Amino acid sequence: MTSTVTVAPPRAETWAERLWAPVAVGDEDTAAAVVRAAHGAGLDAESVLLDVIGAVQRRVGAEWAANRLGVAQEHAATAVNEQCVGVLRHSAPPAVPAPGAGRIVVACVDGEWHGLPARLVAEVLRLRGWHVDHLGAQVPAPHLIGHLHRTGADAVALSGSLAPRLPVAHATLTACQAVGVPVLVGGAAFGHDGRYARLLGADAWAPDARAAADRLARGPLPPPPRDHVMSADLPHLADQEYTFVTRSRQELVRAVFHGLLDRYPPMRAYTALQREHTAEDLDHVVAHLATALYVDDADLFTGFLGWTASILAARGVPAASLLPALAVLAERLRDFPRALGLLAAGTEAVRGAESGGAHAVRAAEPLPGAGLIPGAEPISGADPLRDEASRDADEAPR
């Protein structure tokens, strides 16, 4: 008597582990073969997208944060994952939209360069039978609105990973609503619980691509409110603290930079390149302070500092290296009570990280630079001395 043993096909976690090896070394051909094999073995396309490619991309972020991948390696790995999405698109063509299927525009907030999350959302929606216009990263609001007028879209899915772009996201979603198109938002910028989506008046929020597709499948988003006034969402902005910090961003970065030369002695030995990276990191701190003022939420600022402390710890730099920068900022902003409150909370968060160990790295967060670390290269291409701050301030509700 013989028996037949049925061997279950590998699970998504197994395929993610197999994909990791070629992605980590930038091997596009082998990575593509793994994706084809996963789908060919019976794993549905949505799971390949989210539980294999998406899982590997989260690991890429975690490995960079833990200082096990360099910036160039992180960029190469992300590029391979982008290629894998395209490979799957050819292996598993999306469903043909049914007659009357809705049209969803998927776009990233202007200034948002993390484009892969939005692309995953777009591909999942295509697989589920929607007409999808994927506009990619860094979409200026006027161009998005023009596209809505031309296409008659039913909804916008707006993606944002960078918290400092929340004011721009607010202006963008309000502009979409003004032309009658509801907006679903998602991404780390809107908070792990969607708190900033609700604060800024988004019509819906989703924590991930599946949840976004499920929400849209349940029925149309509610029609946007008529005559929505942005300033009504954020009455605390009347104190002008956000506007001042944003418009003074370059000056504040310079002041903190020069203050650190006296208060953080290791910086005196930095090379010109290391000093440039430090200026970029200080710009991140000021940008997150301004955004915390915009949403009036200390958690945004303390969370960023705790995460930054973990990045520094992974590179052998004490979290206390952040304290002099916060002290100089407090001196410069002594006449701004909300800013002082945020800086005090941030100081306590850094001290807590220093005494109790750095916070666990959150791979879903956007990755700032690490210029306080000698020899480190920041991932951001932002120039802290470039005058873009005034534009963001002008987009704030009056």
Task: Give, region by region, the residue ranges found by the protein language model.
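N-terminal intrinsically disordered, cationic/polar leader segments
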Residues: 247, 268-271, 384-386
